[in-house]
Amino acid sequence: MTRRRRIYEGKAKILFEGPEPGTLVQYFKDDATAFNAQKKGVITGKGVLNNRISEYLMMKLGEIGIPTHFVRRLNMREQLIREVEIIPIEVVVRNVAAGSLTKRFGIPEGTQLPRSIVEYYFKNDELGDPMVSEEHITAFGWAAPQDLDDMLALALRVNDYLSGLFLGIGLRLVDFKVEFGRLWENEEMRIILADEISPDNCRLWDVKTNEKLDKDRFRQDLGNVAEAYQEVAKRLGIMPEAGPGDMKAPKLVQ
C-alpha cells in the first residue's frame, strides 16, 4: 500500500492528498461521535455505507445542477473529491422539530414546522459549534454576503430535492446539516456543496412508523445503528455489492 499524505482528520472522515492537483481522497471511518464528541463509539460498516449513500446523493444533486465536490467513488471507503476552501459554517435546514430545536423552543418532537427553517452554526469544536446569525458570519468575515446568499439558495434546493427523493422511499427528511466550500477555477470562485450527505448528518424517519433511521439511534442509545443505515441504503437501492458483511475497516498506514 502506498503511503499517502494525510491532510486532515475529522470525527468521521480522513482527507488524504489526491492523485492529481486540486483533488483529495475522502476516507470514511466507522467512528461515531455525538454531542460535540463527548460521546464516542465505533459502528462497524458505517464508513462503507456512508461512502455509498453520500456518493449516490451527491451524484443525484449534481444531475439537477447543484455543484458538489464529489468526483467519483474509488473503493468501499474512499471517494475522490475536489479540493475546496471550506467555509467554517454548518448550514442546518429543519422541516420537522427535532434535536436542539425542541429544547430551545419547547416544541414537541415531530411537530411539522410552518416552513423550512435555516440555521447557521460556526464550526468550532472547542466552542461547541455555536449558533450564529448572518450578521456574525459577514462581520467576522467567515463568508461574504454573496457567499451566504449562494449557500442559502443551494441549501434550500438540496432540501427540496432530497425531501422528495426520500419521501419516494418512505422516509421523512426531518432536518440535515451541510457544509460548503469555495472552488477556484481560472480566477473564478464559486460556492459548491462539500463534506457528505448521509444518515450521519440527516435525520430520517420512516413515514409510517416514525422509526429513526439515522445517527439519533447512536445519540439516544436506541441500538441497531448499522442496521438503520443499511435500511436507508437498501431503500435507495445501493447496498454495497458484497453486502453488509464486507465492511471491516482496512488498516491505515500512519
UniProtKB/Swiss-Prot annotation:
GO terms for cellular component: cytosol. Coiled coil: none annotated. It is an enzyme of class 6 (ligase). GO terms for biological process: 'de novo' IMP biosynthetic process; cobalamin biosynthetic process. Pfam families: SAICAR_synt. Pathway: Purine metabolism; IMP biosynthesis via de novo pathway; 5-amino-1-(5-phospho-D-ribosyl)imidazole-4-carboxamide from 5-amino-1-(5-phospho-D-ribosyl)imidazole-4-carboxylate: step 1/2. Gene3D superfamilies: ATP-grasp fold, B domain (3.30.470.20), Phosphorylase Kinase, domain 1 (3.30.200.20). It catalyses: 5-amino-1-(5-phospho-D-ribosyl)imidazole-4-carboxylate + L-aspartate + ATP = (2S)-2-[5-amino-1-(5-phospho-beta-D-ribosyl)imidazole-4-carboxamido]succinate + ADP + phosphate + 2 H(+). SUPFAM superfamilies: SAICAR synthase-like (SSF56104). InterPro entries: SAICAR_synt/ADE2_N, SAICAR_synt_PurC, SAICAR_synth, SAICAR_synthetase, SAICAR_synthetase_CS. Its EC number is 6.3.2.6. It comes from the Bacteria. One of its GO terms (molecular function) is ATP binding. Keywords: ATP-binding, Ligase, Nucleotide-binding, Purine biosynthesis. Disulfide bonds: none annotated. Belongs to the SAICAR synthetase family. This is Phosphoribosylaminoimidazole-succinocarboxamide synthase. It comes from Rhodospirillum centenum (strain ATCC 51521 / SW).
